[in-house]
Amino acid sequence: MEVLDRWAEFTPLLQNLQLSALEVVPDVELVAPLTYPRKVICAGANYYGHAEEMGTQRPDPDGEPFFFLKPPTTTVVGPHDDVRLPDRADVDWEVELAVVIGVGGHNIDERAALDHVAGYAVANDLSARGLFPRKDAVLAPFGWDWFQHKAFDGSCPLGPGVVPSWQIDDPQDLTLRLTVNGEIKQEASTADMVITVPRLIAAASRVLTLEPGDIILTGTPAGVGMPRKTFLNAGDLVVTEIDGLGRLENRMVAA
């Protein structure tokens, strides 16, 4: 986190780093690149293909994004960590591009938004579909429980590292992929996003101040399990990857 707090200072050092001169360290176990991000801000319904498969109307590209939050200290786990499945949760998978903020700000101009990005990572926005509807809610309008749906422990595998922003030519031209036990479930391009990365950053910063170390998850493409009523089980191996950013391999285990 200290590097991100001093991102402007470290950027030229990292840009001039000669990767060929670095020594490869064997037998290292990777943990989440940001164990305790300040905020995990998530965009929902942000891919045309995903909206279509969920049976909703076509998203309005001129509309405002929908955001929700994940608790940063208990949901983020590493690229090889096990994830405990809550009971009766019908947990679903969602490969997502994660944007890591390096320069904070409020009311960020969309045209300068990418200047605030430190880098990008791979994320899996695991979702407890079975816990989303609440028939026991105290009042009918509160019958959809985003807290149980998105905030359970370990619901945000992240990593394997943070690829600096200058190494990614275009965040809207990346291929995302997710497999369960070797079977491809999701494969799409970030070009299918409804609201682009710069617009997401600008919109989020109008609501709250973005800080170094904040993570913005940018939505998931088509291929989730919900429309097919197919969910994760204990023992399943979920591989989440984005070309140029790396891959996560997370085993699902019983609660």
What is each stretch, according to the model?
Residues K39-I41, P65-F67, T74-T75, E96-A98, ...:
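Structural motif
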